[in-house]
Amino acid sequence: MRPYYEDDAVTIYHGDCREVMPLLPTPDAIVTDPPYGLGDKWQGGGGETTKSSWRFDPSEAQAWDSAPVPEVVDLASAAPAVVIWGGNYYALPPTRCWFMWDKKQNDQWTTAQAEMAWTNLDRPVRMFRMAQAEAYGSMNKEHPTQKPLALMSWCLEMMRLEPNALILDPFMGSGTTLRAAKDRGYRSIGIDLDERYCEIAARRMAQEVLSLRLGIWSQRVVLGLHARTDRVGR
């Protein structure tokens, strides 16, 4: 199957993860945030998310947006290490270790004060504390349930993966898992059914490559200037 995007660390596929995953190598880890209840959640609120350019159109909801995806349960045994955000919506096996995001929300009635991720790890519960208002900085959310980059990077840290591990996100969205994996030196594969998100994720990965190259170039320029200054000083 031809990738939608590919570089040295990241591969993105546009398609149904149920069809794409059998064609892929077995990953070392799965880190994902599958859709659940988006259709119901967003239809009554005017259709706009806070600090976001994303706008929900109920007519665009996928069939699984109004109910949990049953195939998500199969992911629990699809890799040696698995993290599934929203795992409390699924009939997943009992686990000792949940990842928790404490959003530090003061509102006790209308919004969740925390989010939960099911894991298959044999460790105590782990808590990530960051106010939702601070989690995204100046970045616009491009997906309704987009997780903060810092949160996904923390997930990977807590998983204690081997260097160069291969991470799969079958519900990639805007590509935050892939970005976090790339920043930590891991390889990753992302899949999404919506081509818009494949485009957004590919753009984020390409920008990272460009930023890295510009950073290396700038560093070389600075080092060159220092070298010239040293020669002049002598």
Where are these regions (language model features)?
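Short, well-ordered alpha-helical scaffold segments within catalytic/effector domains
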Residues: 18, 69-70, 148-153
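Short acidic-hydrophobic surface loop/beta-edge motif
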Residues: 1-7
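Amphipathic alpha-helical segments that form coiled-coils or helix-hairpins used
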Residues: 11, 20-23
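Conserved SAM/SAH-binding loop
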Residues: 15-19, 220-221
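Conserved SAM-binding strand-loop segment of SAM-dependent methyltransferases
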Residues: 9-15, 213-216
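A short, well-structured juxtamembrane/interface segment
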Residues: 63-75
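Class I S-adenosyl-L-methionine
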Residues: 23-32, 36, 40-62, 76-234
